[in-house]
From Swiss-Prot:
This is Glucose-6-phosphate isomerase. Pathway: Carbohydrate biosynthesis; gluconeogenesis; Carbohydrate degradation; glycolysis; D-glyceraldehyde 3-phosphate and glycerone phosphate from D-glucose: step 2/4. GO terms for biological process: gluconeogenesis; glucose 6-phosphate metabolic process; glycolytic process. The gene is pgi. Keywords: Cytoplasm, Gluconeogenesis, Glycolysis, Isomerase. It is an enzyme of class 5 (isomerase). Belongs to the GPI family. Catalyzes the reversible isomerization of glucose-6-phosphate to fructose-6-phosphate.
Amino acid sequence: MESKWLTVDTKHLYGFDEAIFIQKYQKKVNQIHQQFLNQQLPDGHMNGWYSQPDQDHKGLLKQINTIAKQFNALKVTDIVYLGIGGSYTGIRAILDFLKPEQKANIKVHFVPDISAFNIAAVARAIKGKSWALVVTSKSGRTLEPAVTFRYFRNLLHKQYKQKHALRTVVITDAVKGLLVGMSNQYGYAHLTIPSNIGGRFSTLSPAGLLLAKLCGHDPKQLLLGTLTAKQELANSDLNTNSAYYYAALRHWLYTTKKLKIEVTVAYHSAYEYLLLQHRQLFGESEGKGGKSLFPTFSLFTTDLHSMGQLYQEGEKNFFETVIQVQTQFHDLELPPSDFNNDDQLDYLLAKSMNEISNTALEAVVEAHFQSNVNIIKLTLKERTTFMFGYFYFWLSMATMMSGSLLGHNVFDQPGVEVYKQLMFAKLGRE
């Protein structure tokens, strides 16, 4: 299936007949689509991410611009960002995906856990720098950002005293939660996460938009990407809706082909967090009731020298989803050797780095397919701010449909609460 911005290639799926496939899934997809639009799915009110692209963002963008100007006036060079789960993975995915085009001279230090090693390393890195603190947490009580916020807020206060408030941004609920109280008391900038947007669907809420802006990317282009995707995916027809098509393919491979694992693959290390975001969206939305695909990922060509052996000759209980970006920001030519071709690479002189990488991709797809691996290939048109917004919304729609086809509530995560209750009991929180 081909559209202007994204192509789903199914020619490396064994036994796949598109006409039979669409006939099998179309009615159920139509039903789920209408239930989603009418908020009739379990926790169906948690669809704020779907209505977000159509909203007027002038007020939010004005707030973000004000923060960016203030940080610029304060000559901020480093940002410490605190967040966990979707409030971390997605934001990191944006910045890594767009890193070659970063225009602002800002260094973002992510603190996504309570590792003393990582916290100490970031504290050393910002010592003597002009830095600011951004925290994302709806409740303000999630352990990881709460602990790290105490630590780094103390550091910020020690360095800047009362003026630390000018360098602090809280991204949280509109009216409730610990961070709201702190913001009101100390005058921190406060950006609001709508209460009907869950963490893994919140990448392009204020957290992602603010960090994108601070790093010199255009949040309007991210939002335009989501709006374009929403418009293109408004119809549930599997002949045109590529996100639903992909969701149904995953279900077909899981139920009909009995494949239990999806290995999502990309060929650039900068896409690692995009793959992690894919894993979180599907894993947290579908991992319920003992009935779900197990989403994992590999970065090629690096992992070809480890996991490549398993994929080629191991048990075929998995399928691959390969993500390729058609147009890159940059390319490089292999230069002529200054050492008389002693590395014997002159046969590559007519090829660019991207050509070599794409050739490796084609060869791996062919090799794995010959070894009975089913492969879906997703091709994104370009590596741009707009494209990230488009693909993130596309993945969110695919997640909603895929999990709903399995009969799950795609908007909750009750399993995550089990360890939290045990952990807080052991730590003594009342």
